[in-house]
Amino acid sequence: MSGYFVLKASGTQYMFNLHAGNHEIILTSERYTSKASAQDGIASVQKNAPDDARYQRLTAKDGSPYFSLTATNGQSIGRSEMYKTTQARDNGIASVKSNAPGAPTKDQTQA
């Protein structure tokens, strides 16, 4: 099973998650003020995910590794969860690279 995006609304804001084939969330977006902007964010993830240079490998204050996926303009378009090891973070990046391009979107904004 391949990955998929879930587009959600929360009040007047929109966001999306990228799920791996096992249904685990591997990337969470920023919040958007319009559905169209969130859909553009999904398209940007699909476009930028294969490019390793678009990933910032970061460490939280508590030492937990995580990553941020950035667009060509340098703006963050999604972040990972906090991982226990850098290897787990790198596996998360590999999962985004393989699951995001061409992933369908499940629109839950009408639910």
Curated annotation (Swiss-Prot):
Stretches forming sequence repeats: 9-57, 60-108
Question: Which protein are we looking at?
Answer: UPF0339 protein BP0521
- One matching Pfam family: DUF1508
Q: Which SUPFAM superfamilies is this protein grouped with?
A: YegP-like
Region ranges (Disordered)? 86-111
Task: Output the superkingdom of the source species.
Answer: Bacteria
Q: Give the originating organism.
A: Bordetella pertussis (strain Tohama I / ATCC BAA-589 / NCTC 13251)
Q: Its family?
A: Belongs to the UPF0339 family. Duplicated subfamily.
Stored Gene3D superfamilies: 2.30.29.80
Record key words, sorted: Repeat
Indicate whether Repeat appears among the record's keywords: yes
